[in-house]
Amino acid sequence: YVSKYDPTKIVIKADGQALGKGVVLPRSPEGARETILDFMVRKSLREAGERVLIQKRLEGQEVSVIAFMSNQIGLLVPARDYKRAYDGDAGPNTGGMGGYAPNENLSRETLYRIHDVILRRTQFAMRSEGIPYRGVLYAGIMLTDEGPKVLEFNVRRGDPEAQLQLPRLITPLLPAMEATMRETLDPDMVRSDSR
């Protein structure tokens, strides 16, 4: 199946929890086949790789947008993490090699778009499906020429991102967490130093 696609135009993803190591950007048809064999037959990711997704590869800069989701949305300062090992992003994905915040590739206009178009709609859709989510939502976003695109959602903060974002909070963390759970969150309860 995977041989029908140009390997430089796809991403192969494990369909389970792979601790940041379940995404491969193949460079050749052989590399694509080996990735699928590695995940599904050799069980390199155990249960996480029993099923795989083959998706269109997006080009652009990645940004990690983490929010407290409740009755309102409280955004942490956006960050950028580096997942690939080795210089020049030449190696496999990892749980995170490092990162920085704030993410200077993200304009205020684009952040508003992510907030209003992606996060608010996700919040509305979850409530409409009877899944009113309260907690931390991690949105892995690719900033493409066509606008921001969601790569993934996680219901946790990323580790490199948390190390960058939590020290930048200028409001206390515990009241924001409690308000998130009680659905009394005010976005001003999650303010960060954006310098």
Predicted regions and their residues:
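ATP-dependent carboxylate/phosphate-activation module, predominantly the ATP-grasp catalytic core
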Residues: 67-69, 73-118, 154-169
